[in-house]
Amino acid sequence: LVGSEMFIRDRLRQTYKHTPIIIGGIEASLRRLAHYDYWSNKMKRSILLDSGADLISYGMGEHSIVEIADALNSGLAVSDITFIDGTVYKTRKREDIYDAIELPHYEEVLADKAAYARSFYTQYCNTDPFVAKRLFETYDGKLFVVQNPPAKPLTQSEMDQVYALPY
């Protein structure tokens, strides 16, 4: 993260202590798992860990952001939002990760280009929202970043509703 992003994150946490921070958009989507950063010329961890955010909404977020809002509005803690397609979450509980493909550990990806290639290939093969599996990668043997399958695309009717909004 750059200084301004860290400043904003810190001010949000300071001002709104109990408000979940959910990130999305192109940067979060492309950096949701371990990735090569061209600016620094090195491998980086998931932006979920480095940003201090609670959750990532990746890809087209029209469905997932509404589901996240509904879950939070119903009283669910952000740490319990682990089931929404199009999201990435972090956990320390390996036993709670089910029906998922384990990617090479972050430390392995750092040390071995072939491990990164395997990870990237697995991610690439799981981009179709109709057949994709849940993926996860391990950090330091005790922290897990879990990517749920991509959100389903909008129907024509849903697309019309979204683009009829006054923005």
Question: Locations of the language-model features?
Answer:
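Generic structural signal for well-ordered alpha-helices
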Residues: 9-13, 69
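Catalytic cores of eukaryotic secretory-pathway lumenal/extracellular enzymes that build
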Residues: 27-34, 66, 70-75, 82
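Two-component system phosphotransfer/interaction surface
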Residues: 60-74, 156-159
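A conserved mid-domain beta-alpha-beta active-site/ligand-binding segment of alpha/beta enzyme cores
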Residues: 84-109
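N-terminal [4Fe-4S]-dependent radical SAM core
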Residues: 122-167
